[in-house]
Amino acid sequence: SLSMYKVVREPVTPDYLDEEELQRIIEFDSPIERLVITRDMFLFGCFTGLSYIDIKTLTNEHFETDKEGRRWIKKRRVKTNVLSRIPVLPMAQSILDKYSGGKTLLPLQDCTDTNRNIKNIVTLCGIDKKVTFHTSRHTFATTVTLANDVPLEIVSQMMK
């Protein structure tokens, strides 16, 4: 029986991209359209903190504008049902604008394909880290929120 074995897991420090690495991804370009789309979807994750499934299920109904004219994403996380209120930063807005008019809000590819494309992009950008779509969430929680003065209570609420 396996019950006599104890699984010892090393605590995993989730990788995130620092500002310089994030800048490399922002500046990445390719003649291969699917890589450009993947870059944009990954950056949307970096600038909203939304997970893959939360981006996939994002609709226009999740957006609201406050009295000051700032746009917010108000959405429950699929995984935890926790309600998040996320500021729509300029980078996220420009990605939404770029893909507006499509069949879906954002052209997110299959998760496996997306992660394979991310691996290629990261390699082409000379970044030596194991990066998946989930890395974008941690990049938001660290690098992006610091650079954009996103209040800590918003970040901690979103990371639940």
Task: Locate predicted features.
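C-terminal catalytic core of tyrosine-transesterase DNA break-rejoin enzymes
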Residues: 43, 47, 53-54, 137-160
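A short linear hydrophobic-aromatic micro-motif
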Residues: 72-75, 129-131
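Short basic/aromatic active-site micro-motif
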Residues: 37-41, 111-112, 128-148
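Residue-level detection of the helix-turn-helix DNA-binding "recognition helix"
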Residues: 60, 119, 123, 146, ...
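C-terminal catalytic core of Y-nucleophile DNA break-rejoin enzymes
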Residues: 11-12, 77-120, 126
